[in-house]
């Protein structure tokens, strides 16, 4: 999809976000190919995701929640994987905070202590996803401002914005990538008083030109205020 988009818009700078990283030879090769297509990307950005795919894929696809792996072992393994990634690629690696897969299971992945531990061990900067922060805070019955203040905000270089929605069955927040709400704009304004990202990315996955235009105009006004 990126290759086709580059052919249509050859002059537009593209920033590639890997998301969940596959730490093996096919994963590294795919990342190299993406970087070649997006040479303007200043960073390699990946999820700060110590949970193995064996856990996350069943949870996301089928709502199947397997037994939790060792938090200590999972975090140690992820730190080692990030360090190997840093050796393979010249671009700095930045890490995106994760939401909560479940309000009671696997919470170590999005604990502020885990994010601090990985950041300090790897030296990576932070990609702060505000939708993920809202979901992680709600899973802990914690005020989202208190949750965000517990993160390494001085290391934030990029932010992701996306509209959350509530699951009709569970009532829990999820990252819907819908239009931003009033609460999202207010949270962004509050966060920008405490962090200084170089990039802000709107993750909007719908095809409503009016909604996209409205969000971009409101974001521009807020950021430039």
Predicted regions and their residues:
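Active-site beta-loop-alpha junctions enriched in small/polar residues
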Residues: 17-23, 47-51, 98-100, 131-135, ...
């Amino acid at each position: 999809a990126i290759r086709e988009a580059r052919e249509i818009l050859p002059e537009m700078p593209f920033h590639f976000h890997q998301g969940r990283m596959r730490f093996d030879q096919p994963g590294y090769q795919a990342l190299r190919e993406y970087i070649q297509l997006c040479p303007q990307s200043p960073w390699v950005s990946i999820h700060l995701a110590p949970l193995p795919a064996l856990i996350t894929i069943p949870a996301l696809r089928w709502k199947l929640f397997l037994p939790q792996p060792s938090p200590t072992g999972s975090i140690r393994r992820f730190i080692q994987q990030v360090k190997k990634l840093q050796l393979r690629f010249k671009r700095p690696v930045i890490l995106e905070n994760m939401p909560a897969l479940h309000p009671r299971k696997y919470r170590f992945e999005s604990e502020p202590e885990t994010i601090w531990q990985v950041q300090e061990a790897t030296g990576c900067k932070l990609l702060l996803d505000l939708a993920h922060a809202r979901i992680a805070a709600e899973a802990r019955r914690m005020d989202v401002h208190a949750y965000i203040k517990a993160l390494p905000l001085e290391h934030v270089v990029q932010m992701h914005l996306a509209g959350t929605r509530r699951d009709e069955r569970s009532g829990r927040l999820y990252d819907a990538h819908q239009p931003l709400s009033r609460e999202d704009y207010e949270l962004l304004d509050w966060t920008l008083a405490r962090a200084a990202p170089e990039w802000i990315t709107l993750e909007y996955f719908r095809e409503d030109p009016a909604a996209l235009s409205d969000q971009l105009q409101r974001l521009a006004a807020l950021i430039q205020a």
